[in-house]
Amino acid sequence: YCTDIGLRNAKLNFRQQEETHIMENIMYNELLCRGYFVDVGVVEFVNTKNGKKSKTQVEIDFVVNAGSKKYYIQSALNLSDDEKMNTELRPLKNTNDFFKKIIVSKTSMKPWTDEDGILHLGLYEFLLNDHSLDL
């Protein structure tokens, strides 16, 4: 991740304007500014299809630690359809613990918690509210 998105863009001659990567980078920088320790996580689970088992690994964008608190955070530019929603939620649903799970999307919305206990936040709420992870 880059510390300064503007310098990143200038170094790349403004050729790679991938909004998803820029959003994730901004979120990473914000988490560091708030004093969190930030890692990337991997969740492994077993799929059974046609009687055959296979292991699948999926990434959690951010595993955020602060003292005894831990948060799993997914960054998603948009969650416009069920397939995209399921892709982003799958890593969070397959963690085998009870730490807080959060998905942040660019969509402007009021924070809400789904039936699986996953907090859904808009990007602006995440960035502008220093306590957004504890809503």
Identify the function of each model-found stretch.
Residues 1-135:
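A cross-kingdom feature that marks ATP-driven nucleic-acid transaction machinery
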